[in-house]
Amino acid sequence: SGRLQTLCYKADIEAALRTPGFAGFQLLDLHDFPGQGTALVGVLDPFWDEKGYVTPKEYSTFCNKTVPLIRFPKMVWLNNETLNVPVELAHFGEKALQGANIIWKISNQSGEKLAQGSFVKDLPIANCIPAGNIEYALSGIEEPSQLTVSVEVKEANNSNRWNIWVYPAKQKAVEKLPYIASTLDDQVMNRLEKGENVLLLLAPGSILPEKGGDILSLIH
């Protein structure tokens, strides 16, 4: 999907910008290729128009002359942990920025601000510029939640953001597990007609390897 493509480009570009000794990157075309066959893999269509799933403004949050970055050790956390991640900057603007104001914020899916902070940092023309650490105890997150961590550089008029997921460390007991089956037989159909929950897991070997059976074996 287009959103997955955007996330993949974001991850690749940010990885390049976090690389010490970074000397630039090249994207092999950004629009769909219509000649000698068709490759509908571009961020833009063959006429260099938007496709509707990402805007130039969003794309520039992670592909720009000044980009805030975070080194996340993981994107899924438990609420008995403390989010502690370093903030970095990649700055390749026309000149260095003196006393840049770097503002971070953590919010939930409702847009409610949970925490915020700031750093002041001189930004030379370079990457891997350390700004400081974001530290936030996740103990107040009682239900499975998606949080957004954003970092803004005021003087560069650019901000970047990432989604993380927080789950309770103590799992609730499941009162009644679903019925687990490997085939859709009469017994399964009877349970479904009664309103019961059924988890259908295909048995290893039930699908040919070339049809995805090799992946099925890995799952089991």
Language model: regions and residue ranges:
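Flexible loop/turn segments at secondary-structure boundaries
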Residues: 32-37, 113, 206-208
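Structural motif
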Residues: 180-185, 200-205
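Substrate-binding clefts and catalytic carboxylate motifs of secreted carbohydrate-active enzymes
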Residues: 1-99
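Conserved small/polar residues in nucleotide/adenosyl-binding loops
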Residues: 220
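Beta-strand-rich binding/interaction modules
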Residues: 82-120, 131-134, 145-154
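Short, exposed coil/turn segments at beta-strand boundaries within extracellular/luminal domains
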Residues: 155-161
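Low-complexity, Pro/Ser/Thr- and charge-rich linker/hinge segments at domain boundaries
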Residues: 162-183
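Short, flexible loop/turn segments at beta-strand junctions in immunoglobulin-like
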Residues: 138-140
